[in-house]
A protein has these predicted regions:
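Mid-bilayer segments of alpha-helical transmembrane spans in multi-pass integral membrane proteins
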Residues: 106-111, 140-144
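Membrane-interfacial helix-loop-helix
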Residues: 1-16, 37-107, 128-130, 136, ...
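Hydrophobic alpha-helical transmembrane segments and immediately flanking/interface helices
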Residues: 110-137
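Generic detector of bulky aromatic hydrophobic side chains
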Residues: 26, 123, 172-173
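Transmembrane helix boundary and interhelical junction motifs in multipass membrane proteins
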Residues: 21-33, 108-119
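Alpha-helical transmembrane segments and, especially, the helix-loop junctions at the ends
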Residues: 27-31, 60, 114, 143-151
């Protein structure tokens, strides 16, 4: 990213990424703000999706360490075992896990969707690669839907002159 942005744009983008990771801001907030600040919609979508995938990768690959945390580890082991028993009695439900994790990551919430999706996928007993693929698919789909929608709304607001003059000077003079 540093190679494709000026130093001030890079610092702004880094700030938006940090804000995305920390609640209460989510992708539904950060992507429109980035677009309003002049970043292309596709750049914002890819940047935020990258954060989801990176946090999902970290959590998925290191989730086994959570089983070793005192007090929390035994609770996670118990929850995972109950989930596995439930899956054995309802085998048809296991086929929906991929799409459930994808939807879980795609729908905006507090913080990174990759973090939540990785934990949910591993607690459901999914292997690492399907969890990562579901996170990737959900992050890209959700971020691109929000980015395209935000760019379309900003375009319509600018074309129709529905923004106040101060905000219009910032948002409408940028490339959408």
């Amino acid at each position: 990213m540093y190679a494709t942005l000026s130093s001030s744009q890079f610092l702004t983008m880094a700030g938006l990424m940090v804000v995305y990771i920390l609640p209460p801001a989510g992708k539904e907030t950060v992507i429109p703000i980035g677009i309003a600040l002049g970043f292309p919609w596709w750049y914002m979508a890819l940047s935020i999706a990258m954060i989801d995938v990176e946090t999902g990768l970290f959590m998925t690959l290191n989730f086994d360490l959570a089983y070793k945390i005192p007090f929390l580890g035994p609770l996670l082991v118990d929850l995972t075992q109950k989930t596995e028993r439930s899956i054995e009695s309802h085998r048809w439900f296991a086929g929906l896990y991929f799409f459930a994790i994808m939807l879980f990551v795609m729908v905006p919430g507090l913080g990174s969707g990759g973090f939540r999706g990785a934990i949910a996928g591993r607690l459901l007993g999914m292997d690492t690669y399907p969890v990562l693929l579901a996170i990737l698919a959900g992050a890209l789909t959700g971020c691109f839907i929000i980015a395209l929608g935000s760019a379309a709304v900003f375009s319509q607001l600018c074309i129709n002159g529905l923004l106040p003059a101060d905000i219009s000077a910032i948002v409408c003079n940028r490339t959408l």
